Regions:
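Hydrophobic N-terminal alpha-helices or hydrophobic patches in metabolic proteins across all domains
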Residues: 1-167
């Protein structure tokens, strides 16, 4: 299964950028309150709607960071299931679909344990100093569950889009 990820935040950034879905422009939302940096390029899967009402979040493992607004053709290898102050906030872990350096990564257990721990640690602590924000439970699941969530998020998006057209 392949899909497009729109990068909002490149790896190594503390700036939290978000795409304004009405204008398509990129807005600086805030600087992270903690001294942590994004451990991978971070953005969302196009034409999806996650449980939190936003597009489904995605991280892309790359050799080099890209830039806000970059579109990457990806495939899922796993997902970090987490809950924040607004509810379910899953993060799909992806690799570029056509990168031969990532060909061997097919499922979550193919991602180095340290890389998984680094990503997990980031999401467990990145909101720690922000008033009113929190991260609750979190765990890794494999590619099959990630792809099922992508399909469910596409269906949510299509239902919402169809519902909006009727009203």
């Amino acid at each position: 299964m392949e899909f497009d990820v729109v990068v909002e935040i490149p790896k190594g950034q503390r700036n939290k950028y978000e795409v304004d879905h009405k204008t398509g422009r990129i807005r600086l939302d805030r600087l992270l309150f903690t001294s942590t940096q994004y451990p991978a390029d971070y953005g969302f899967i196009e034409n999806t709607l996650g449980e939190d009402g936003d597009p489904l979040d995605a991280l892309v493992l790359l050799q080099e960071p890209t830039f806000p607004g970059c579109l990457i053709r990806c495939r899922a290898v796993g997902m970090f299931r987490m809950t924040d102050e607004k509810g379910g906030d899953d993060k799909v872990l992806c690799v570029p679909a056509t990168d031969p350096r990532m060909e061997h990564i097919r499922d979550i257990h193919h991602v180095a344990e340290f890389d998984r721990l680094e990503i997990q640690h980031f999401f467990e602590v990145y909101k720690d100093l922000e008033p009113g924000k929190s991260v609750e439970g979190a765990n890794w699941v494999g590619r099959v569950e990630a792809e099922a969530e992508i399909v469910a998020s596409i269906e949510r998006f299509q239902e919402t889009e169809h519902h909006d057209e009727e009203h």
